[in-house]
């Protein structure tokens, strides 16, 4: 037993099906290696069932067998099979980012919709929290690369991930999988299906995934980065005739985990202050799984929904598809965001509730002639309610005092003298901070269509369109209780300076009461300019250091909206289209040429970092005489209010693509060469105290993708995928980057710079061999490896990463359906930091997420 545990073991697919079920439901059993892997693969990338060979789109397909053999549990693991897809998990389980061809966003803010759309059984999952659960009883996963807005709508400017699950069967069967691995990992998955009548079939699937954390909070003696999730999924299929089918799906899954560990990459100058307060930091250990905190990082997600799909043949040549769905997501997170044992940040918690309703209708033709069409409509309605808070902990006041040489607390008396409403002893008080409440609504309508016209037997001209109207509205009710951040230091210093000068001159003149009048000060300055300069310099030396405390004003007052100037609404309309010419040379080789556009609607910044646009407000204290602006004119200006963005404008994508596909007995390939352009890419960058949301004027990439499969002999199959990307910011004057000398972020002109996080080369290769040990037993050996060339992790910093993953499995399969598998993932255990960010409220400190360990 010890030997088996060393290499990893799982009991796989303990089937309760008879052999005939396994034949009718290949998605529920491993694909035998001796099968012809070049056989036609059916996909629905064009919203029609077509072979992969006949689909003129760059599509990567992961079958159920590949997912099983590589031990892929969720979309985070899927990137090891599709090199042009990159998935990154950030500070919580709910913050996962999907990137295709170097384009992608949508994490860290509920108001930002992703550029990569995720669909499960045709239903859009609008946020990553609704996408990251363990994959259900799947049939295949399709990754559509490049803009797909013509058929998939407003949030497909970079691509689509489409997960297709198995329908209920009219023959009784099922599957049970139980797995045990390192870190006490226990995974149980099962499904059962069968008929209730000749026209009604049902299925029920469930999963349970629990694992100890591979990281630890040293001072708390608690685990981090654990797994604790489960889900259940039920389906009803009613098919009274071959012309009508109704499929109803209901599902619920839950995540209750501690995630995600953060490593100290560089301990900046503030580290000394943390340690002086008795705090602990695992300094300069970029790949360590040991960290310090005051509370574990809580991640709780409830994801649920129901959908109904109707497929009806209206006439002999027309079919109607209707998909109606409701999705709900509840998210709760809480984190000690300073990532030290010093109690600097008390709470950083967030409660989010998302309700989404979608309705899609499609009318499809099936004419015998050269002309066929698809015409559809789509409705989207989403409501988000978000509340959260970030508060100071027990040590924050002392931390600020240490950094300011005592000036933070020592300034209270002076500042209270010119701000009489300030409470005493409240600078940096425990529990002060920001308190947020957002109500967000998004409503969108679209009509779309596609026409195929066969010019000749092999040549087809296609054209498609999508017209979308998207309306968003946000209402905020936010407040800051940070007393120190509410003070106008410029005005306070000006008042203290004037008072100090008046008092000094009054003393020299013997003025009763001790303070000279303005007229007396002016007369003194005229009569004795040298003396006045000396007095001014002396007073300035006393009061000007207060201006150096501005960086400690972390949480200034928030201007809520809608208000008299800002209506809190956006309205976007877009016409996306596709023009494609496809040519089939013969039954084995086909090609296509495509020009397509894509669209992503505006995204609101649902965080305390939401600020008025510069067109509405020019910041500055009244004593500095800032230029007039609408918000100031309306009397809405607040102390320390700054400008920024309320929302990022829409993304508009375009792609030029040429593809070539081949399929022979034992060998197939798909090649796509492209140039892709994205105008208005929505950039959301963390800068240590918050996120900067904006638009890059233009970002582009060019490259190619090659997917191939080779079966040289009956029992041996090889797969390979290669992606080459050459991206750059063509225009991004308002970017954000690190200063490598200080490790702090700031504005940067990134025009002409290669975006961080994008490899030039990415490859994924795999091999599967089947050995017939007897008539009733076979052995399936599988190995796959993916590698990405080095890339810059964070804009402006020298750190680079070159990720790789090696996975392997060995399966013994009995003819009666019982299988036993030993498996391992990430066996080479490479060390790198996929993400680096500035330390929270710790200038000069760098933090990051360490790469995960091997599992088996």
Predicted regions mapped to residue ranges:
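N-terminal Sec signal peptide and the immediately downstream disordered periplasmic leader
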Residues: 1-70, 76-80, 242, 312
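Periplasmic N-terminal accessory/gating domains of Gram-negative outer-membrane beta-barrel systems
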Residues: 29, 57-106, 116-134, 140-148
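C-terminal beta-signal and adjacent terminal beta-strands/loops
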Residues: 36, 391-397, 786-794, 812-856
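Outer-membrane beta-barrel translocator/receptor signature
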Residues: 70, 96, 113-115, 127, ...
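Periplasmic-side early beta-strands and strand-to-turn transitions of outer-membrane beta-barrels
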Residues: 162, 170-171, 177-179, 191-293, ...
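Solvent-exposed loop segments that connect transmembrane elements
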Residues: 215-223, 259-292, 336-347, 389-435, ...
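Membrane-embedded beta-barrel scaffold of Gram-negative outer-membrane proteins
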Residues: 309-313, 319-325, 329-335, 584-600, ...
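Gram-negative outer-membrane beta-barrel transporters
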Residues: 373-374, 668, 673-678, 694-795
């Amino acid at each position: 037993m010890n030997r088996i545990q060393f290499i990893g073991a799982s009991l796989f697919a303990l089937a309760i099906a008879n052999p005939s079920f396994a034949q009718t439901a290949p998605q529920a059993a491993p694909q035998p290696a001796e099968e012809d892997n070049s056989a036609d693969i059916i996909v629905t990338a064009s919203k029609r069932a077509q072979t992969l060979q006949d689909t003129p789109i760059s599509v990567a397909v992961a079958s159920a067998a590949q997912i099983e053999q590589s031990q892929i549990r969720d979309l985070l693991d899927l990137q090891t099979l599709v090199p042009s897809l990159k998935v990154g998990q950030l500070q919580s389980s709910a913050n996962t980012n999907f990137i295709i061809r170097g384009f992608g966003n949508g994490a860290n803010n509920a108001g930002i919709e992703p550029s990569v759309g995720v669909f499960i059984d045709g239903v859009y999952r609008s946020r990553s929290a609704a996408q990251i659960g363990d994959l259900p009883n799947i049939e295949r996963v399709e990754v559509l690369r490049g803009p797909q807005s013509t058929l998939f709508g407003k949030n497909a400017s970079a691509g689509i991930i489409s997960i297709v699950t198995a329908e209920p069967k009219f023959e009784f069967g099922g599957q049970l999988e139980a797995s045990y691995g390192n870190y006490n990992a226990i995974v149980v998955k099962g499904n059962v299906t069968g008929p209730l009548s000749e026209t009604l079939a049902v299925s029920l699937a469930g999963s349970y995934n629990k694992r100890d954390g591979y990281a630890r909070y040293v001072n708390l003696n608690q685990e981090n980065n654990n797994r604790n999730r489960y889900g259940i999924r039920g389906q009803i299929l009613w098919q009274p005739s071959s012309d009508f089918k109704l499929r109803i799906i209901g599902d619920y899954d839950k995540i209750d985990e501690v995630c995600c560990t953060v490593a100290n990459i560089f301990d900046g100058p503030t580290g000394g202050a943390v340690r002086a307060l008795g705090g602990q930091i695992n300094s300069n250990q970029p790949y360590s799984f040991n960290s310090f905190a005051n509370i574990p990082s809580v991640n709780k997600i409830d994801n649920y929904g129901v959908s109904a799909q109707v497929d009806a043949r209206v006439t002999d040549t027309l079919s109607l598809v209707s998909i109606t769905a409701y999705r709900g997501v509840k998210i709760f997170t809480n984190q000690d965001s300073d990532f030290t044992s010093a109690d600097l940040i008390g709470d950083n918690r967030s409660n989010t509730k998302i309700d989404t309703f979608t309705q899609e209708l499609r009318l499809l033709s099936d004419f015998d002639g050269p002309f066929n069409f698809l015409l559809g409509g789509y409705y989207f309605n989403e409501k988000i309610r978000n509340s959260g808070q970030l508060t100071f902990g027990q040590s924050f006041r002392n931390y600020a005092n240490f950094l300011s040489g005592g000036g933070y607390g020592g300034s209270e008396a002076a500042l209270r003298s010119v701000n009489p409403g300030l409470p005493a002893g409240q600078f940096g008080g425990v529990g002060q901070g920001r308190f947020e409440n957002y109500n967000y609504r998004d409503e969108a309508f679209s009509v779309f269509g596609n026409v195929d016209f066969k010019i000749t037997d092999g040549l087809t001209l296609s054209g498609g369109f999508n017209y979308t109207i998207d309306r968003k509205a946000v209402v905020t009710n936010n407040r800051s209780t940070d007393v120190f951040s509410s003070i106008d230091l410029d005005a306070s210093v000006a008042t203290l300076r004037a008072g100090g000068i008046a008092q000094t001159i009054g003393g020299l003149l013997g003025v009763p009461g001790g303070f000279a009048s303005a007229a007396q000060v002016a007369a003194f300055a005229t009569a004795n300019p040298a003396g006045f300069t000396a007095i001014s310099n002396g007073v300035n030396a006393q009061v000007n250091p207060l201006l150096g405390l501005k960086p400690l004003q972390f949480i200034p007052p928030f201007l809520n909206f809608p208000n008299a100037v800002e209506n809190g609404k956006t309205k976007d309309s877009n016409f996306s289209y596709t023009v494609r010419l496809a040519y089939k040379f013969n039954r084995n080789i086909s090609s296509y040429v495509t020009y397509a556009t894509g669209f992503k609607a505006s995204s609101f910044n649902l965080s305390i970092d939401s600020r008025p646009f510069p067109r509405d407000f020019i910041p500055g204290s009244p004593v500095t005489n800032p230029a007039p602006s609408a918000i100031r004119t309306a009397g809405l200006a607040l102390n320390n209010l700054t400008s920024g963005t309320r929302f990022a404008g829409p993304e508009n994508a375009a792609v030029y693509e040429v593809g070539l596909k081949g399929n022979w007995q034992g060998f197939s390939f798909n090649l796509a060469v492209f140039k892709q352009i994205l105008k208005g890419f929505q950039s959301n960058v963390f800068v240590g105290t918050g996120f900067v949301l904006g638009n890059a004027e233009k970002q582009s990439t060019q490259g190619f993708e090659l997917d191939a499969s080779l079966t040289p002999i009956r029992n041996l199959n090889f797969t390979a995928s290669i992606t080459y990307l050459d991206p750059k910011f063509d225009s991004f004057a308002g970017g954000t980057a690190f200063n490598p000398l200080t490790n702090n972020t700031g504005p940067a002109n990134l025009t002409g710079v290669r975006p961080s996080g994008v490899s030039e080369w990415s490859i994924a290769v795999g091999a599967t061999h089947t050995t017939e040990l007897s008539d009733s037993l076979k052995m399936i050996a599988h190995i796959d490896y993916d590698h990405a060339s080095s890339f810059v992790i964070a804009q402006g910093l020298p750190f680079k990463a070159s990720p790789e993953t090696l996975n392997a499995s060995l399966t013994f399969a009995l003819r009666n359906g019982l299988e036993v598998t030993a498996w391992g993932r990430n066996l080479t255990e490479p060390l790198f930091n996929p993400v680096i960010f500035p330390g929270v409220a710790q200038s000069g400190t760098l933090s990051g997420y360490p790469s995960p360990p091997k599992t088996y």
